[in-house]
Amino acid sequence: MAPSRTSTVKNKNASKHAANGSGIRNSKTVSRAQSDGVSKSKGKKATQSKGAPPKPQKQGNKMATLKKKRRVYTEKELGIPSLNMITPVGVEKPKGKKKGKVFVDDRESMMTILAMVNADKDGQIESKMMRARQMEEIREARKAEHERKQEMQKNKLKGMKDDLRKKRKRGGDDEGDNVKGEALAGTKPLKPKKKTVSFA
């Protein structure tokens, strides 16, 4: 028997390429042959993504819209009184009426109201004038009192100065007489000694 030759396979992919009938790896025929076997549908994924979202997401959207649509009322609309505020009766706005407008039916009542307001204002002005006059009188009285005190102090100072001068004059005359008498007697020198002060 003759020895049979075996073909050595150098490349694993060589047998595949040999089956296709071409030696080139990335040929079009190879890709066609592989794709011819199985066909996949890609339309299903596209329809799912383009279609409507599932039901649980819809419910979530509805809840979000309900929360957004809820109206928030202000304190004014709810009629809550504002705290820490003292509002006079005239300033407070009654519901359904205009603030600060009082309509009078007859002219006489309007004139009486006007007269009352004017009298009140005049009284306030008069009281201010009276107060100003009183303050002026008080100021004048204080001024007069201050001047009187100053004059008294000046008179007192003048009196004290006069007394001191008189005492000095009297004291000087007495000393002069004593010096003259002693000079005649000879016990003391004619000129009196001057006082000297020495500082250390």
UniProtKB/Swiss-Prot annotation:
GO terms for molecular function: mRNA binding. Residues 1-73, 138-200 are annotated as: Disordered. InterPro entries: Loc1. Residues 138-180 have a biased composition (Basic and acidic residues). It comes from the Eukaryota. Keywords: Coiled coil, mRNA transport, Nucleus, Ribosome biogenesis, Transport. GO terms for biological process: intracellular mRNA localization; mRNA transport; ribosomal large subunit biogenesis. Residues 190-200 have a biased composition (Basic residues). One of its GO terms (cellular component) is preribosome, large subunit precursor. It is found in: Nucleus, Nucleolus. Residues 130-170 form a coiled coil. Residues 1-12, 23-38 have a biased composition (Polar residues). Required for efficient assembly and nuclear export of the 60S ribosomal subunit. Component of the 66S pre-ribosomal particle. Belongs to the LOC1 family. This is 60S ribosomal subunit assembly/export protein loc1. It comes from Sclerotinia sclerotiorum (strain ATCC 18683 / 1980 / Ss-1). The gene is loc1.
